[in-house]
């Protein structure tokens, strides 16, 4: 329990964190990786280079300071981060290391006096305990489910399917021949990739792109441009070098962006690009479980060359009366224009979306590039969709949609 004095001091640093938060977290990661380079085997190097991880941590620290007198308010955020930590294999022993480096960064960047550092040290201990407790429960739950496991388990690539010019699916089965644990549609796994010549392991989260209940997991990976970029290095490796029969270490499924199976409301699934992957899991689950809920499936792509799972979604649309699928191409090819194999040219605009969604009284799920997500969030809010019915997933550290 934090004292009133400690709470007062921590809350007094909110303006400082608003101004210098990213500077502090940037320095924090510099200290962390210089003194503990082994942690580069856990953290995503791409998000470090792009500054997304620094921004996400700054947002989390700012929220912690703001709600230090009511930490219950940030438990949903703690759980969201906890899912990511569990999937990466972050353990209780990592927290003291992080705390020490964070306090050093606050002192170096902000010149914080001992009184402030002591208060933050005390507050960090309470926050870390919350993370450790929640993540311990997550580890236990993942390990004790039927077909479950702790940390990483070796999976074999049993099938590799090209879904479009830029997206390829990998079908993964456990090397030990055992079962795979079930998951909730929308969840992801962490895949460990060891690239020859690379000093550190690369960890990447990929949404599971098929319904649960199979003997395999399916992930569908976008090939990023440029093998010299961190993103490109990993995705190009999976596309060009990983073959059927190869082995990949995989974490148990995690994540809180999940289909609400208890709701009876219609479902609207909106995706841009590779954001289609968790939506495929949700769509396939709804039809395989013979759900009677109306489903509106909206996908935005550049054109048919980059449009993954197009034939499958069209087949579902044709077979199931309750499913309506719509496609938006920003730059259709001549063949697309000739065949008229899409519904709208351009972008997913408010006026068009309003004409195709069955009702605003529905559960809305969306995923895609951050600018796309910001736009969809603004449109849904403007249309009066209730906040509790708006669900979204970032591919990478959480950002603001405002």
Curated annotation (Swiss-Prot):
- Asked if Cell inner membrane is a keyword of the record, the answer is no
Q: Where is the Globin domain?
A: 1-136
Record's cofactor remark: Binds 1 heme b (iron(II)-protoporphyrin IX) group per subunit.
Provide the residue positions that the database annotates as binding heme b: 85
Give the positions the UniProt entry annotates as the active site: 95, 135
Give the Enzyme Commission number. Answer: 1.14.12.17
What is an example of a Pfam family matching this protein?
Answer: FAD_binding_6
Could you tell me which residue ranges the FAD-binding FR-type domain spans? Answer: 150-260
Record: residues binding FAD:
188, 204-207, 394-397
Q: Where is this region: Reductase?
A: 147-402
Site feature Influences the redox potential of the prosthetic heme and FAD groups, where: 84, 393
GO MF entry, a single one: oxygen binding
Domain of life per record = Bacteria
This protein's cofactor list reads: heme b; FAD
Q: Which reaction does it catalyse?
A: 2 nitric oxide + NADPH + 2 O2 = 2 nitrate + NADP(+) + H(+); 2 nitric oxide + NADH + 2 O2 = 2 nitrate + NAD(+) + H(+)
Site Involved in heme-bound ligand stabilization and O-O bond activation: which residues?
A: 29
Its GO biological process terms?
cellular response to nitrosative stress; nitric oxide catabolic process; response to toxic substance
The entry's family comment says: Belongs to the globin family. Two-domain flavohemoproteins subfamily.
Which purpose does this protein serve, as stated in its record? Is involved in NO detoxification in an aerobic process, termed nitric oxide dioxygenase (NOD) reaction that utilizes O(2) and NAD(P)H to convert NO to nitrate, which protects the bacterium from various noxious nitrogen compounds. Therefore, plays a central role in the inducible response to nitrosative stress.
Domain characteristics, as noted in the entry: Consists of two distinct domains; an N-terminal heme-containing oxygen-binding domain and a C-terminal reductase domain with binding sites for FAD and NAD(P)H.
Q: Which NCBIfam families match?
A: PRK13289.1 (NF009805)
Protein name per Swiss-Prot or TrEMBL: Flavohemoprotein
The opening ranks of the lineage are: Bacteria, Bacillati, Bacillota, Bacilli, Bacillales
This chain is encoded by the gene named hmp
